[in-house]
Amino acid sequence: FTTGSCAAAAAKAAAYMLLSGMEKTEITIETPKGIPYTAQITDIQRKECAVTCAVIKDGGDDPDVTTGSRIVARVSLPEEQPDSGEKRTQAEILIDGGSGVGRVTKPGLDQPVGNAAINHVPREMITKEVLEVCHLLDYQGILQVEISVPGGEELAQQTFNPRLGIVGGISILGTSGIVEPMSNQAILDT
């Protein structure tokens, strides 16, 4: 499964644990291809207003430098929930990259300059899965999701990222949610 699938699964699990107070050691998401992915959840750290957990990336037979990496999600409540005066009908999910996730420095990529290198499909997956938890647990406030990859800065040196203008880490990628071995599309998406 892609780094995007791993990020979405970790974010969903962290959101569930934060909002429910219950621990999750596995979680299932639906990939954009409609294939369910059940991920094992590791490295759970709980605080009053945040939960951090990880999913270990399994790239299958694809020679992917991220295979075996921990894709970490930290889901937190903002220090203050802004009051816009209107009642929310659903939660708002704010996504950013942390340590080991690259930042876009050149125009023409999937994300604008300055954004974390978390492509639009993984962003949509994370949002969909976290909103599903919010709906299930009747939460309509703001949640902050930060995706990080320990060792991502070093891994990025083995990718096209430095040449593409993505600095500081790897990209969180995926269009189908499934690693498609040695595909031309995977190279273009990078």
Predicted regions and their residues:
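Glycine-rich anion/phosphate-binding loop at the beta-strand->alpha-helix junction
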Residues: 150, 154, 162-190
